[in-house]
């Protein structure tokens, strides 16, 4: 299993505020409503065991879930296992959200005396793996996929969920053709108790963390921070590498604080515009999640067009094609914000 020490940009980190005492627990973590009714089953070891109509098979690659077979139908599921004591916290985000085409939810939940078993539909890889294996995603395909990602985030924000740890790896494919995405792992989300989305817990993945989370301020607004992370995801899809890279965390975080990145050559003007609308250093200047869906790049044919140099300003300098997702370097960058 990867760790923060390995500098994996997809692995979460936790950063405490550097000044002032920590306030009381964030309101989003307070109990709201009861979770859905659970089926009670005996406690048992999770591997190679029968569990109601399911049989649990080997662990999945990440070691946090298991393949499961629904015996009556032969359908394969993913089973996530949690301590039974965490049932309320795990299920609360799912009970808050109405069903949505691009947000995963448990097909069935079984509660034992010690363990909670949540069964999700089988997936076929995730966006991080797709970009890592293929590099840049062509604009038409990227727009098709990103529209689904933005719709999932907008649905969560509209119903009082802040994701905090948004990244490509959390968007998984539900079909073999890899054309339909759902957002998973909502159990990590903050459930807001009102319109205020102010958060104090600074938790994110290094490559996706917003500049406001790296500041010395004790709190930050959760929804714009999610939008920044979604902007990082979009840039990575279109460029094949992260917008902010550094061989050490201090270098990476310095670039994020400055908002320094360079868009790749060959992108259409609407695509470039959308990336810049999401990766704004000031949270209040970013698009809201619902506004992303109204952007021209997601409304029509996003085929790349040749850009005239007259359309390129200092904020539009480009880097050569071919950089991989794991490649790092300092060349070709320009600070987008003063």
Where is each model-derived feature located?
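Conserved short submotifs of the Hanks-type protein kinase catalytic core
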Residues: 113-126
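Catalytic-loop of the protein kinase fold
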Residues: 157-174
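Terminal C-lobe "cap" of eukaryotic-type protein kinase domains
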Residues: 280-285, 291-305
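Short beta-strand micro-motifs within the conserved protein kinase catalytic domain, predominantly
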Residues: 105-114
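Activation segment signature within eukaryotic-like protein kinase domains
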Residues: 145-146
């Amino acid at each position: 299993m990867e760790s923060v020490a390995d500098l994996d940009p997809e692995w979460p980190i936790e950063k405490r505020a550097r000044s002032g005492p920590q306030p009381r627990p964030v309101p989003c973590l307070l109990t709201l409503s009861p979770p859905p009714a659970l089926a009670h089953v005996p406690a048992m070891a999770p591997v190679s065991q029968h569990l109601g109509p399911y049989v649990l098979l080997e662990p999945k690659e990440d070691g946090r879930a298991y393949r499961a077979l629904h015996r009556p139908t032969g359908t394969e599921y993913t089973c996530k296992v949690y301590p039974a004591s965490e049932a309320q916290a795990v299920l609360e985000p799912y009970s808050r959200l109405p069903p949505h085409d691009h947000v995963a939810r448990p097909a069935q939940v079984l509660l034992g005396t010690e363990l909670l078993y949540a069964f999700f539909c089988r997936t076929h890889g995730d966006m991080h793996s797709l970009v890592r294996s293929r590099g840049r995603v062509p604009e038409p395909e990227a727009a098709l996929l990103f529209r689904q990602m933005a719709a999932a985030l907008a649905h969560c924000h509209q119903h009082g969920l802040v994701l905090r740890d948004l990244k490509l790896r959390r968007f998984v494919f539900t079909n073999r053709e890899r054309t339909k995405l759902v957002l998973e792992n909502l159990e990590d989300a903050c459930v807001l108790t009102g319109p205020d989305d102010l958060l104090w817990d600074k938790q994110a993945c290094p490559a996706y963390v917003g500049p406001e989370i790296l500041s010395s301020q004790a709190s930050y607004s959760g929804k714009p921070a999610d939008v920044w992370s979604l902007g990082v995801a979009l840039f990575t899809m279109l460029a094949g590498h992260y917008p902010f890279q550094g061989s050490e965390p201090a270098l990476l975080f310095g670039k994020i604080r400055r908002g320094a990145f360079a868009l790749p050559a060959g992108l259409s003007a609407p695509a470039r515009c959308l990336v810049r609308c999401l990766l704004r250093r000031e949270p209040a200047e970013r698009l809201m999640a619902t506004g992303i869906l109204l952007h021209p790049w997601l409304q029509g044919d996003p085929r790349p067009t040749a850009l005239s140099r007259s359309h390129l300003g200092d904020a539009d300098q480009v880097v050569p094609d071919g950089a991989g997702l794991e490649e790092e370097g300092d060349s070709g960058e320009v600070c987008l914000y003063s």
